Amino acid sequence: MLEFLKGKLIEKNPAYVVIENNGIGYLVNISLQTFSFLKEADEAKLFTHLAFKIEATTPVGLVVYGFATVTERQLFRLLVSVSGVGNSTALLMLSALSPDRIISAIQNGELAVLQSVKGIGSKTAQRIIIDLQDKIGKEKVSTEFLGIAHNTRKDEALIALTTLGFNKANSEKALNRLLQKNPEFSVEQLIKEALRIL
């Protein structure tokens, strides 16, 4: 079992990073929370979750998910334990909402907050709350995640959205509208706002 990966950051995008360790480059899928946490780091230690990807169009493969903190990984694992919430949906939730906000929404039964995430309908939101309310209890999540903006914000946001499976043209239109509305949006803000309108 792979508990964590530590090494040099070869590539960094809002949706994934490539970490080199002992001459091997690992592609690790990340949330926006983790992307923000990495800042301008040259090296990183990410706590990992491994999953098998089984699709009709591609061969079976191992997918690595990485998280800046153990707490974020625990929340990811709790989310994927809920029927109807897969790895991509859980990662999308952690990108659209902070771990604190997700936990608060579950504890307080706030369906609307969970439903604000693309792909989470009423039934899935209810299932998340019912299945996880007792498991989460009074658990606190670290709020050490900080925002970051570098390179071309629009390009990075576009990469993240297309990696998450959204249409490139629609994503670009949404990002252009958002930047016209507020040119100061960070990459994370752009992606979060785009997730709400796509």
Regions found by a protein language model. Name each.
Residues M1-L5:
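Short coil-to-beta-strand transition motifs
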Residues V187-L198:
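Amphipathic alpha-helical interaction/assembly segments
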Residues G7-L9:
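Conserved hydrophobic positions within beta-strands
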Residues I128-N176:
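Strongly charged, low-complexity linkers/loops
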Residues E11-V113, I128, D134, K138-V141:
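Long, highly charged, low-complexity intrinsically disordered interaction regions
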Residues A90, I102, A125, S171-A174, ...:
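Small-residue helix-packing motif on alpha-helices
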